Amino acid sequence: RQGIGSAMLSWAEERIRQLVKQHGTARTAVIGANAMSSEQDATALLLAADYRRVFSLVELKLGDLQQLPELGSELPAGIRTGPIGTSHYRAAWRTVVDSYADTSFTQKWTFQDFVDTADPACWRAAWNEQDMVGVALCSIRRHQHTVGEVEELSVRTDQRRLGIGRVLLLDGLRSLREQGATTARLFTGTANPHRSYDLYESVGFRRQNEYVRYRKPLAWSTGHLTVRSVHRI
């Protein structure tokens, strides 16, 4: 085993340099790699090769959807919740996009992408009169029908810390349970300024894995490139 990971990483980096030389156009080339925090050998390999941690995602699991807590708090006056229909799609998409406006490491998500992957059976929203102020977008895993996913939980900036997120999350989890899910999972960034962990843990989620993203610059530049899944070596 010793030396195989280093050899594979060196080969992958050299291959990327060749591709950049042939096709690259940018001036700030970087190589990216992934490793779980529990994979100590892969992490040590990347750090020794001058990769630096840039961000990470944590996987959380709720083991039993039959054991959901009671709401524990009421919604603010004027706020109501309900399912998301097709006529609400654009407002739901905009609510999510706007909630990420001040964050880094987010991919562009067009409205057409939203529509193409829409699966609203377990989607819930909150409104203040006619204005949508938050969404919980949950779904059943396609090939694991007993596992639910919390794909997005977003509340508009001016409506946070009012208990709306917790109510939406519990509504979404109950919808998953009604659709046959027995457990639920979600991913969230560790550099989250809104203390989302406290909310997720308050309804029963527990940390499972942390997936760390590493990057390092190339010696010369032409684009953003990625070595994927180094932890599988």
Segments the model singles out, each with a brief description of its role:
Residues 101-155:
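A conserved beta-strand-loop-helix scaffold within acyl/acetyltransferase catalytic domains
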Residues 2-18, 155, 161-178, 183, ...:
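Conserved acetyl-CoA-binding loop-helix of GNAT-fold acetyltransferases
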Residues 169, 192-196, 213-218:
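Short glycine/proline-centered loop/turn elements that form peptide/ligand docking sites
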Residues 42, 46, 200, 205:
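Conserved active-site tyrosine of GNAT-family acetyltransferases
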Residues 31-33, 150, 184-188:
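Conserved hydrophobic beta-strand within the GNAT/NAT acetyltransferase core sheet
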Residues 80-92, 233:
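A short beta-loop-alpha structural element at the N-terminal edge
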Residues 1-76, 210-216:
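Acyl-donor-binding surface of acyltransferase catalytic domains
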